Regions:
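A short hydrophobic beta-strand segment most commonly corresponding to one strand
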Residues: 41, 86, 101-113
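A short, N-terminal "cap"/entry segment at the start of jelly-roll beta-barrel domains
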Residues: 1-36
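A generic "binding-loop/recognition-motif" signal
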Residues: 48, 56-57, 75, 91-92, ...
Length: 113
């Protein structure tokens, strides 16, 4: 069993191109023995965003704090605290913080595809 406070996990800067003012904490990952899923906590500063990207795995997102939009190829959806998103594999997406406070969200991704 792993038990840790999220602030004890390193806040890292992702290396992907197209990121602005976004960081991530890998709360649960393979290094913890998790073989099926990773749990990540993202933090996006006001005006910041993830890259517009797609990948061959689905993921599930729970918005903890903040507000903004999730942009897709054909539409965009606003988000606020408490919202949940399912993003299927190969769907273009980008999280943009349009609010005045830090956006924080949990994102779960599979290891097995």
């Amino acid at each position: 069993m792993k038990h840790v406070h999220f602030t004890d996990v390193n806040l890292e800067e992702p290396s992907e191109e197209g990121i602005k003012d976004m960081k991530v904490r890998w709360l649960i990952s393979k290094k913890d023995g998790a073989e099926n899923f990773a749990m990540r906590l993202f933090e996006i500063q006001p005006g910041g965003h993830s890259p517009l990207h797609q990948h061959d795995w689905e993921h599930e997102v729970f918005i903890l704090d903040g507000s903004g939009v999730v942009k897709g190829e054909k539409r965009q959806e606003t988000y606020k605290q408490g919202d949940v998103f399912f993003i299927p594999s190969m769907e273009w997406h980008q999280f943009v913080n349009t609010g005045t406070t830090v956006t924080k969200f949990l994102c779960l991704i599979p290891y097995k595809k």
